[in-house]
Amino acid sequence: MKSILGKKIGMTQIFNEDGSVVPVTVIEAGPMVVTQIKTKEKEGYNAIQVGYIEKKEKHVNQPMRGHFGKAGVSFKKHLREFKINDDEQFNLGDEIKLDIFQDGDVVDVIGISKGKGTQGAIVRHNYSRGPMGHGSKSHRVAGARSAGSYPARVFKGRKGSGKMGHDRVTVQNLKIVKVDNERNLLLIKGAVPGNKGGVVTVREAIKSK
């Protein structure tokens, strides 16, 4: 299992040996703690649940206090589950650190994209606008999206205005430029989804070229 949770710090740039500029996203990744182990015999599949970022006791409800107490770990703010292979062995309380990755690895980054609120069809779906003059009354509307008297409604799923952003987004095949184990920092080439401070999942690329 080569996956880790991290917090997006922001973007910066570094320079290659030839002087070219490389835009990178800085992610503070790990360490994660194993809070639960699932087995094929009991749950039907092999997986581990991990916790990330400390959480104050007053914000933890009673069921979760029992869950963390059973694992013998401190309270965590974020929990995620990762499937593991049959030959991988983990124990409750094990730490998963950044050293599972190396410089040059290709990864996928999963995060929640920035929320844009309610947007019109032009911004949300890249529609073309209508004429701006000559008596036109349809400047930025979505246009015809259904038939007339029948079915007399718009079918579900048609593109139009509405909520934009705040979706789970996966960016594939990004290259790790540098791994800083001392400061738990990942420098990944390019942009990753989400706001500064947002939690992202960095995993080994599934469709690496």
UniProtKB/Swiss-Prot annotation:
Keyword RNA-binding in record: yes
Annotated stretches, region: Disordered: 127-147
GO terms classed as biological process: translation
Keywords, ordered alphabetically: Ribonucleoprotein, Ribosomal protein, RNA-binding, rRNA-binding
InterPro entries, per the entry: Ribosomal_uL3 (IPR000597), Ribosomal_uL3_bac/org-type (IPR019927), Ribosomal_uL3_CS (IPR019926), Transl_B-barrel_sf (IPR009000)
GO-annotated molecular function: rRNA binding; structural constituent of ribosome
Gene3D superfamilies in alphabetical order: 3.30.160.810, Translation factors
GO CC list: cytosolic large ribosomal subunit
Pfam family, one: Ribosomal_L3
Stretches that traverse the bilayer: none
Subunit structure: Part of the 50S ribosomal subunit. Forms a cluster with proteins L14 and L19.
HAMAP family: Ribosomal_uL3_B (MF_01325_B)
Entry's family note: Belongs to the universal ribosomal protein uL3 family.
Role summary: One of the primary rRNA binding proteins, it binds directly near the 3'-end of the 23S rRNA, where it nucleates assembly of the 50S subunit.
The protein, known as: Large ribosomal subunit protein uL3
Organism, as annotated: Finegoldia magna (strain ATCC 29328 / DSM 20472 / WAL 2508) (Peptostreptococcus magnus)
Gene: rplC
